[in-house]
Amino acid sequence: MVVAAAIREEIEIPEGVEVIINNNEVTVKGPNGEDSRKFTYPNVDITEVENNVVLETSFPRKKDKAMIGTTKAHISNMITGVTDGFEYHMKIVFAHFPMTVKVNKDVVVIDNFLGERHPRTAKVVGSAKVVVKGDEVTITGINKEHVGQTMANLEQATKIKGRDPRVFQDGIYLISKE
């Protein structure tokens, strides 16, 4: 089996975005803010060459090749986050008991879910911001993982156990990603 001597991937840095690389910690600054992340995989070298982020590895194994792709995706998501940001839209669905959703600092409180007396809570992760307008919930942020995990926390908080999901369709569901 022939093995490539090296793998090299490049990510172009757009106008108005600054990338700082310091000991495998990548910091991306852009018009929407700043995001940083430490990449600790030993066989992947991260450098900046002529307005490009370059990821390299020598004599790669399967895991090294996979980590190059993963690291490239993470850095691309960081660049997208500081330029455009991420926005997820969710819909509050209820049939009989009108639930109310409120945001208190870094916790989303769901009252009267299926007529329950105790409120359910969902954690807002990291730099994500949650806005509730009527029956729409909008989650925005520059870090894709924080926005996605906050969305998952909201969905899990309204998960119904022990009842037929075809009948009890109440909850907060994802309707679109931007």
Curated annotation (Swiss-Prot):
Asked whether the UniProt record includes Ribonucleoprotein among its keywords, one would answer yes
Disulphide bonds annotated for this chain are none
- One Gene Ontology cellular component: cytosolic large ribosomal subunit
Q: How does it assemble?
A: Part of the 50S ribosomal subunit.
What does it do? This protein binds to the 23S rRNA, and is important in its secondary structure. It is located near the subunit interface in the base of the L7/L12 stalk, and near the tRNA binding site of the peptidyltransferase center.
Q: GO terms for biological process?
A: cytoplasmic translation
Q: Reply yes or no: does the keyword Transport apply.
A: no
Family the entry assigns: Belongs to the universal ribosomal protein uL6 family.
Spell out the molecular function terms from Gene Ontology.
rRNA binding; structural constituent of ribosome
For this UniProt record, the keywords arranged alphabetically read as follows: Ribonucleoprotein, Ribosomal protein, RNA-binding, rRNA-binding
What's this protein's name?
Large ribosomal subunit protein uL6
The gene name on file is: rpl6
